[in-house]
A protein has these predicted regions:
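His-Asp-centered metal-binding catalytic motifs of divalent-metal-dependent phosphohydrolases/nucleases
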Residues: 46-78, 88-98, 127
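Divalent metal-dependent phosphate-bond-processing catalytic cores, especially two-metal-ion Mg2+/Mn2+ enzymes
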Residues: 1-4, 15-43, 55, 83, ...
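Acidic-glycine-rich active-site phosphate/pyrophosphate-binding loop
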Residues: 3-7, 48
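Short glycine/proline-rich turn/loop motifs
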Residues: 10-14
Length: 178
């Protein structure tokens, strides 16, 4: 499945993350996982999900980075690039971003509406079951990897600690769909 938004998302991700081969490998793995969910959504929503999979880490690109909080920076870019509100909100709120924004004292996510919970759960599932190298991984292993990369005082570490149960609940909800 490759709709117009997904194709545009791929071009943006491959261009803007070109110098970050590890991150791009992860993004490609997330896209592969997201394509599994296409049959559960209408064509437009499925296209938005795959586009968001391509774009969920675009906020790490130097050309996009503004605040240093990749979900917010990415969502602002996605909105300004005309990908639509669903894609922007998925990028904004993916994988526990609301908890991390709170840990960072950022309020910028309030500019975005909450995406449908099932679509957000699907993107979160895909992100949490794809390792940093793009290979499938258990959500527990992925979260352990994130915790190991960030010290206990880092907002990422604190957010994963605080949001772990909800993140794993999203993964469980989506496993039933597969």
């Amino acid at each position: 499945m490759s709709g117009v938004l997904a194709q545009r998302g791929r071009r943006e991700a491959e261009s803007r993350l070109a110098g970050q081969s590890g991150r791009l490998a992860h993004v490609r793995g997330v896209v592969t996982a997201a394509q599994q969910f296409g049959r559960h959504f209408d064509a437009e929503t499925a296209d938005c999900l795959v586009a968001a999979a391509w774009l969920h880490d675009i906020g790490y690109a130097p050309s996009v980075r503004r605040t240093g909080f990749h979900p917010l920076d990415g969502a602002e870019f996605v909105r300004s690039a005309g990908f639509g509100e669903l894609v922007a909100s998925l990028v904004a709120f993916h994988t526990g971003a609301r908890v991390e924004a709170s840990e960072r004292g950022l309020e910028g996510l309030s500019e975005f509406s909450d995406p449908p919970s099932d679509v957000l759960d699907a993107l979160t599932f895909c992100d949490l079951t794809t390792g940093s190298d793009g290979a499938p991984v258990s959500a527990d292993d992925r979260l352990s990897d994130v915790l190991a990369r960030y010290g206990p005082e880092d907002p990422v570490h604190r957010a994963v600690d605080a949001g772990r149960e909800e993140l794993l609940a999203a993964v469980r909800r989506m496993r039933d769909w597969l």
